[in-house]
Design a protein with these regions (language model features):
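Flexible glycine/proline-rich, aromatic-decorated loop/lid segments
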Residues: 1-31
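Long, contiguous, secondary-structure-rich segments that constitute the structural scaffold
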Residues: 36-38, 42-87, 150, 156-170, ...
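Long, low-complexity segments enriched in small/aliphatic residues
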Residues: 62-159
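Pocket-edge structural micro-motifs
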Residues: 9, 30, 47, 112-114, ...
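Short, well-ordered loop/turn elements at secondary-structure boundaries
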Residues: 1-3, 113, 132-135, 164-165, ...
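Structural motif
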Residues: 5, 136-138, 168, 210-211
Length: 253
């Protein structure tokens, strides 16, 4: 677990506080069960930690924390704690405390001279590396339905782990037939950065000429293979496009 200190935090169903999602909804979450033992609300743990670091934090409850947030975030204008207690959920922006939030933004136009959106086209940049004779395929990575991100939580669920228990690389059946592969074969996936050995899965949803690997299995780390080259503007690594090759190998001992 690699932790020097473990705080007795509360679970989601034990918390009082707000959740703000990408749909611009500010929702008040209320506890439905009591916290067990020495468990405490997240804000209480953070306040106590801040005090021990020498900060003069004196919040008495979660509503004080929210009120300070609202004072610095224009998106929370007219959405105070008492309103959330009454309505449970409010969309921002809300232009008055007695008006509903704007569920559809820019419905009456955009803040431009014409009232229309300004759309700026962009020039697409080629990938850092393209397939060639040595690495003729494109490797892309992503998630599987059953495991979230690195699987730190979902792989501890026996139900989810039973559905996706082992790492696989997915390939279109036509590509596999050309190479003489069978379902479940052990294969080596190589890029210019490394090699991972795992089993093969046929998947017609994978485009011909491509391979797909999930990145949630530490025993077959997909990011040993991916390209760390950064996008020049967003500074995002090129995890979704790497030149790769695949070959059949013996089952590891």
């Amino acid at each position: 677990w690699f932790a020097d200190i473990i705080f007795p935090a509360s679970a989601q169903a034990e918390k009082l506080g707000t959740y703000t999602n990408s749909n611009r909804q500010v929702q008040l979450g209320r506890p439905v069960v009591d916290m067990p033992g020495d468990a405490r609300q997240d804000w209480e743990l953070i306040v106590e930690l801040a005090k021990r670091c020498g900060l003069d934090w004196n919040y008495e409850n979660v509503s004080e924390v929210y009120t300070e947030m609202a004072g610095h975030m224009e998106s929370l204008d007219n959405i105070d704690w008492s309103r959330l207690e009454r309505e449970s959920s409010v969309c921002y922006p809300s232009f008055a405390s007695d008006l509903p939030g704007e569920e559809i933004i820019f419905f009456s136009g955009f803040p431009t001279a014409s009232g229309k959106a300004t759309i700026v086209p962009t020039d697409l940049l080629p990938p850092d590396e393209l397939p060639d004779e040595e690495y003729p395929l494109v490797l892309t990575t992503g998630r599987v339905l059953e495991h979230w991100h690195t699987g730190a939580m979902t792989r501890r669920s026996s139900n989810l782990e039973a559905q996706e228990p082992i790492p696989v690389v997915s390939m279109h059946p036509r590509d596999a037939k050309i190479k003489g592969f069978a379902k479940g074969d052990w294969v080596s996936v190589k890029t210019r950065r490394g090699e991972v050995i795992l089993q093969l899965k046929f998947d017609r949803d994978v485009t011909q000429g491509m391979l797909f690997m999930p990145f949630c299995y530490n025993e077959a780390p997909a990011n040993f293979l991916t390209n760390p080259q950064l996008d020049p503007y967003g500074k995002i690594p090129e995890f979704k496009f790497s030149a790769a090759k695949i070959s059949k190998v013996e089952k590891p001992k």
